[in-house]
From Swiss-Prot:
Entry-linked PANTHER family: KELCH-LIKE PROTEIN 32, LD33804P
Mapped Kelch repeat ranges: 252-297, 298-346, 347-395, 397-441, 442-492, 494-539
GO cellular component: host cell cytoplasm
Subcellular location: Host cytoplasm
Source organism of the structure: Vaccinia virus (strain Copenhagen) (VACV)
SUBUNIT field: Interacts (via BTB domain) with host CUL3.
InterPro entries assigned: BACK, BTB/POZ_dom, Kelch-typ_b-propeller, Kelch_1, SKP1/BTB/POZ_sf, Vaccinia_A55R
Record protein name field: Kelch repeat and BTB domain-containing protein 1
Gene name tied to this protein: KBTB1
Written domain comment of the UniProt record: The BTB domain is responsible for the interaction with CUL3 while the Kelch repeat domains supposely serve to recruit the cellular substrates.
One BP term from GO: symbiont-mediated perturbation of host ubiquitin-like protein modification
């Protein structure tokens, strides 16, 4: 006898000939010969059954008629060394039987088979199965597959078998793979129609109501399975009082603008949520120290340096919807770098910076409206400055800190409205080169330089400004001090990434936990090596339906955009 496989083959031969068999598994009219010792060694169920006086020691039969005969037979063959022959048709029966008999290796083999073959065609079936038998591993994997393929599944014949509890779980999930929230009510209505079940308020609460278009809200109002329920209409009548909703992960794209290590080109990167990686989607020739503003999903890059030693007045843009560069944009009124960039609903603003002629600081703010042939003067800051933080909040332009005359930082905070400039509570410390973001009605700044005299100290400070109370609050510091990092807000969280730390480009990112007031290094948003991220913008997907007039079959029209 050379090895265990030969021994198993011999024992299986004994079983087939009935030699030394001391137990019969009875399933209805079928019988399976076996050995108690062999079954006990492979199955926890049989081990307990045969050793704890559950049956008489002289008993020769065990009745398992509540189990599927073919599955039990396949598993006993498996115990005796015959490989399982798994298919999509039999794997569920074999797995549930293996789970009952507690045959660990067979359970693992069945689970691995399902996970390997999981797809949009079988994920609902396996999800319902896993939920019934409380298999968390398969339930989680099949649920994620449903989320990823949800718009394919709304016409699947198994879609109607999902329970209301499952639909609430699906429609509530941040990872639901829809690029526009208007598709969530479509998913709900398709399920209601397939089950002929009336809507409930619990289902409506899963929708991000504040993100829905008026056309889709009207479609909900008018649908018979919604309008017939008084509680649902009452809920929809009060949506104006609901809190603002945050977009789902797939309804926005994180687009970063920076300089790559590939000959220092401008690089546009997109975050892949599925792979948890940044992927370069476009690049162009080198430029640095430029300002960035985003309007209508177009990223504008203003001024800065190109490959010459002189500052530039050129403005270029990248259209995230068409994945194309735009070059025919009017130039700035004069070359400048280290300026601030902002946008409101109509205009792009270029703020302050360093002029090319004599490297002097400028206080001018210019604005440009897309389709207009030139930039126009808008205002002047109280003092010339560069490398300041800028933010647009409640229709006001805020200018924060920056470098002023003498290469020193300032702690000034001012806002510009139609009535002119207004001073606000000063920063707790003089700062420049920090990142700035508006989040949840406040202005947040992080990193940069801070010093009262010469600009030379890299900061890890994070501050928030409340415009209602006109006060600054110091938050937990970054783990890594950095200048000119990118600060962005997505899915109700704050992130900071990139920048320069200790004169070296850093590819690290950090996430802020508001409840714990702490920053955590974020392995999921690590940047490409030697990549300076100037700005990161959540870009909301746009669809032509947003300008479409409402009709009675609007949801059917919406469905035609699936896959586009």
């Amino acid at each position: 006898m050379n090895n265990s496989s030969e021994l198993i083959a011999v024992i299986n031969g004994f079983r087939n000939s009935g030699r030394f068999c001391d137990i019969n598994i009875v399933i209805n009219d079928e019988r399976i010969n076996a050995h108690k010792l062999i079954l006990s060694g492979a199955s926890e169920y049989f081990s307990i059954l045969f050793s704890n006086n559950f049956i008489d020691s002289n008993e020769y039969e065990v009745n398992l008629s509540h189990l599927d005969y073919q599955s039990v037979n396949d598993l006993i063959d498996y115990i005796y060394g015959i490989p399982l022959s798994l298919t999509n048709d039999n794997v569920k029966y074999i797995l549930s039987t293996a789970d009952f008999l507690q045959i660990g290796s067979a359970i693992t083999e069945c689970e691995n088979y399902i996970l390997k073959n999981l797809c949009s065609k079988n994920c609902i079936d396996f999800y319902i199965y896993a939920d019934k038998y409380n298999n968390k591993k398969i339930e989680s994997a099949s649920f994620n597959t449903i989320l990823q393929n949800i718009l394919r599944l709304i016409n699947d014949e198994n879609f109607k078998y999902l329970t209301e509890e499952s639909m609430i779980k699906i429609l509530s999930d941040d990872m639901l793979n829809i690029k526009n929230e208007d598709f969530a009510p479509l998913i709900l209505i398709k399920w209601l129609e397939s089950t002929q079940q009336s809507c409930t308020v619990e289902l409506l609460k899963c929708l991000r109501i504040s993100l829905l278009s008026p056309q889709v809200i009207k479609s909900l109002y008018s649908h018979r399975l919604v309008s017939s329920i008084y509680e649902c209409i009452t809920f929809l009548n009060n949506i104006a009082f609901l809190d603002e909703s945050f977009p789902r992960y797939h309804s926005i794209e994180l687009i970063s603008i920076g300089i790559s290590n590939s000959r220092d080109k401008i690089s546009i990167n997109c975050y892949n949520h599925k792979k948890n990686t940044w992927e370069m989607i476009s690049s162009r020739r080198y430029r640095c120290s430029f300002a960035v503003a985003v309007l209508d999903n177009i990223i504008y890059m203003m001024g800065g340096y190109d490959q010459s030693p002189y500052r530039s007045s050129k403005v270029i843009a990248y259209n995230t919807c068409t994945n194309s560069w735009i070059y025919d944009i009017p130039e700035l009124k004069y070359p400048r770098s280290n300026c601030g960039g902002l946008a409101d609903d109509e205009y792009i603003y270029c703020i302050g910076g360093i002029r090319d002629q004599d490297s002097s600081l400028t206080s001018s703010i210019d604005k440009w409206k897309p389709s207009k042939p030139y930039w126009q003067k808008y205002a002047k800051m109280r003092e010339p400055k560069c490398d300041m933080g800028v933010a647009m909040l409640n229709g006001l332009i805020y200018v924060i800190g920056g470098i002023v005359k003498g290469d020193t930082c300032t702690d000034a905070l001012e806002s510009l409205s139609e009535d002119g400039w207004m001073k606000h509570q000063r920063l707790p410390i003089k700062m420049s080169n920090m990142s700035t973001i508006v989040h949840d009605g406040k202005i947040y700044i992080s990193g940069g330089y801070n010093n009262s005299s010469v600009v030379n100290v890299i900061s890890n400070l994070v501050l928030s400004y409340n415009p209602i109370y006109d006060e600054w609050t110091k938050l937990s510091s970054l783990n890594i001090p950095r200048i000119n990092p990118a600060l962005w807000s997505a899915h109700n969280k704050l992130y900071v990434g990139g920048g320069i730390s200790d004169d070296v480009r850093t590819n690290t990112s950090e996430t802020y936990d508001k409840e714990k007031d702490c920053w955590t290094l974020d392995n999921g948003h690590v940047l490409p090596r030697n990549y300076i991220m100037y700005k990161c913008e959540p870009i909301k997907h746009k669809y032509p339906l947003e300008k479409t007039q409402y009709t009675n079959d609007f949801l059917k029209y919406l469905e035609s955009f699936i896959g586009s």
